[in-house]
A protein has these predicted regions:
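Sec/Tat signal peptide C-region and signal peptidase I cleavage site
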Residues: 17-21
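Bacterial N-terminal signal peptides
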Residues: 7-16
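Positively charged n-region of N-terminal signal peptides that target proteins for export
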Residues: 1-4
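Extended carbohydrate-recognition surfaces in non-catalytic/accessory domains of CAZymes
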Residues: 22-127
Length: 128
């Protein structure tokens, strides 16, 4: 399938974009383990994430996404703050951001992914 299915979420809002993998690094050294030392954008959580929901065909969206932190009442950002490694929380060192949010903040995510051509005409389910 040549069309890109784009997804993003700002809590639950969706949009589209792209990111580059070269600049990701953990944010600080908090809670570093031997496992954490091996995490990269290319190998983050490759296993099926929810054993109770196993599907024969699935695609992980883990990896680098763009992110932005804005006031909670702000519009969709035109420019994003940087890269975040999904599935890690923005507060986590492994996210590459390591930033605390307040109740007055909104966190926006943006990425692009390709739907496999074998899935053409099938129903898709996105889990966040």
């Amino acid at each position: 399938m040549k069309n890109c299915l784009c997804t993003a979420l700002a809590l639950s809002l969706m949009t589209a974009g792209t990111v580059s993998a070269q600049s990701w690094a953990p944010a600080g050294d908090r809670i570093r383990t031997a496992w954490a030392e091996e995490v990269t954008p290319e190998n983050v959580h490759k296993e099926y994430p929810r054993p109770q929901m196993v599907r024969p065909e699935w695609k992980s969206l883990n990896g680098l996404w763009e992110y932005s932190i804005t006031p909670k009442n702000a519009a969709v950002p035109e420019k994003f703050d940087g890269q975040i490694l999904v599935p890690f929380a923005v507060e986590s060192s492994l996210s590459g951001v390591g930033r605390m949010l307040t109740p007055e903040d909104a966190l926006w995510y943006k990425t692009i992914f390709r739907v496999p051509s074998a899935w053409k005409g099938k129903r898709l389910m996105l889990n966040f």
